[in-house]
């Protein structure tokens, strides 16, 4: 992928072939279709044994990181998930056609330990080169909502806005639900995946009423187009859509936001989608398949 990331994102939004309705609920239409699913790690190596789920169907990738979904039930906005221990949640919302074969590529990110904090004092954690998380004191709870006092392991991965693999790493697609439940396209200025765990592996969260400050550096190529404020979005793994919650403020070359819970977070400017489609052909007039649009 060689084009600038914003251009790629815009085209990926156009390719979703949005309906005139602004609802996020797909049409109640089902049909049989097929999909070729390919899963890689951050180094481009195939990942075997990834559990792929589409509706009631599930299967596992082979040694080449591949699974072929043959003539299974899909809908016009099919949600596919990819899970394997040691990796962050992976998923894609794609737009198949009856009787056709779709191609879905995913890059799963390892759950990278980026730091350890003590809940009583809080602390600052660096995620990659461009994201900082600042935890306040006494802000971590266990799965039952009780205050947690042990060491907290912070696992995280950044997805910077100029990452050429952004679309393959991110979950879902770049369509989200606004606070009024209407649908919108999204142009990303960066994302981050974060999980908190105890020493025994218990999933932890931020205490209700508390927030973690996030500072996300914006690539220099995007500073000129960065709004003074943009909505923040978290990814709802159950529904498969990004959902608006809060906003980020531009301070220098960073967006600053306060996050009330953890999952994937996305710093995105909303924009209207349009209905768009195209057929690609070779010089001899034959139809081209699996064309990457950049």
What are these regions (language model features)?
Residues 2-8:
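Sec-dependent signal peptide recognition
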Residues 14-17:
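C-terminal motif of bacterial Sec signal peptides marking the signal peptidase cleavage site
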Residues 68-77, 85, 217-225:
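Short Pro-Gly-centered beta-turn/loop motif in secreted/extracellular proteins
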